């Protein structure tokens, strides 16, 4: 400490940078993220995490050994152009190696099955989850599951049901991307940046999701108030905008037969909120414990997300139409779950 600072602050002042530059292992904590599934989405999730410098170590898994080897090589070849010298590990199908991770992203799926409906992957992705879920948990994993495989809400419910894992540590990407699409569509109508629009899609990550327009705000003012004050600028067809947000992914799919960038960035956003303990409010799929009378399934509502996973779930002021739609959306998730034998304990235990 300089003589001047010593005189001003006192000899016993603990100068915050007194130990700056010391080599102390306690000052550095390695951030590790595993990604299961190296298809279109999983590979782009890994790339987003790498490009944004979110993880210090990436652990990639896939049942296709050749595919995961190629993805690992491609990412390693990018290391000269990204923020940090991230370690990239090829785990093949050795899911137990993910037990060291802070976050495991589930991106296992088969995009061709979801060509017209996210429910198309129902049996494939739930079967895939059974191949790794307990292996990861039984190996000692104590981090956060971020699941983006579709149908997202069903797969999240399955992960919780099969493993008995703390549901707060299972986060579905859910309507996070759909909410971004909603804000973008509203932005196009009213000329306000989507980053300044607070609006959410809720319910199932699928065709039954609902836009929560009654609770939507800009600068703390309800969208309905702004519309009343200046209808020329703020009035628009809510149902049309909701439909555009709901089907945005299929517009992307129509021309390239997959969705990649936005869903990968959405997953990376959740990972960043966890690793940085942001306490960020994001629309995500989480276990219902009585919200609007719903319980026992995962679905999307605005969630506070930090290092421990889902810290709090917010309910919104919904219109009668929105509330009815939310309940119908939850029922659709239950109908999908009812098709799966793991939900029938007797049938599952008989296997």
What are these regions (language model features)?
Residues 8-30:
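A short, basic/flexible loop-to-alpha-helix module at the beginning of a structural domain
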Residues 42-43:
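N-terminal Rossmann-fold NAD(P) dinucleotide-binding loop
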Residues 118-183:
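Rossmann-like NAD(P)(H) cofactor-binding subdomain of soluble oxidoreductases
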